[in-house]
Regions:
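Zinc-dependent deaminase
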Residues: 1-22, 73, 86-153
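Small-residue (primarily alanine) positions within well-ordered alpha-helices
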Residues: 15, 19-22, 32, 42, ...
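Short, basic and Ser/Thr-rich N-terminal targeting/leader segments
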Residues: 26-30, 74-76
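Short beta-strand scaffold segments in enzyme catalytic cores
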Residues: 30-38
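A cytosolic small-molecule/anion-sensing beta-strand core signal
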Residues: 36-37, 64, 76
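Short beta->alpha transition motifs characteristic of CBS
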Residues: 41-48
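A short, polar/charged loop-to-alpha-helix boundary motif
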Residues: 50-60
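Immediate flanking context of iron-sulfur cluster ligation sites
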Residues: 72-84
Length: 153
């Protein structure tokens, strides 16, 4: 449960549904769900191949959807649930959007930028540092990624 007594597992499961759908489209299986006041306001999976857009990461897609709906570039009352540790690109967008909390399932030792790599939120140039929680549904998210890449080798 989060501080607001919302069901973290339920939101992370919805992110996993988006990740599985991304895998079925041939995309790297990462899914994200953005939540405000216990309600899902946006959800997406990676679409970089489909949209021919290297920035079409699940996190950016949900941030764009929610900002458009809110008619604001800031989402300070929102929480992000994502199946993989955000990369530097996504961490930057999370910071600029002023997202309150980030929950991620699997660590990304190679491309992650929250607990790995540049640790973007710990940098003095970071505009906003959200609360970060990791490890929810980590095994399932990790296995989804491993099986996706194993099938392509």
């Amino acid at each position: 449960m989060t501080k607001d007594n919302y069901d973290v597992a339920s939101f992370m499961e919805q992110a996993l549904v988006e990740a599985r759908a991304a895998a079925e489209r041939g995309e790297v299986p990462v899914g994200a769900v953005l939540v405000r006041d216990g309600e899902v306001v946006a959800k997406a999976g990676n679409r970089t191949l489909e949209l021919h857009d290297p920035s079409a990461h699940a996190e950016l897609l949900v941030i764009r959807q929610a900002c458009a709906a809110a008619k604001s570039q800031r989402l300070p009352d929102c929480d992000l649930y994502v199946t993989l540790e955000p990369c530097t690109l996504c961490a930057t967008a999370i910071s600029f959007a002023r997202i309150r909390r980030v929950y991620f399932a699997a660590d990304d030792a190679k491309g992650g930028a929250v607990t790995n790599g540049v640790r973007f939120f710990d940098q003095p140039t970071c505009h906003h540092e959200p609360e970060v929680y990791s490890g929810m549904c980590e095994v399932e998210a990790g296995e989804l990624l491993r099986s996706f890449f194993a099938a392509r080798r």
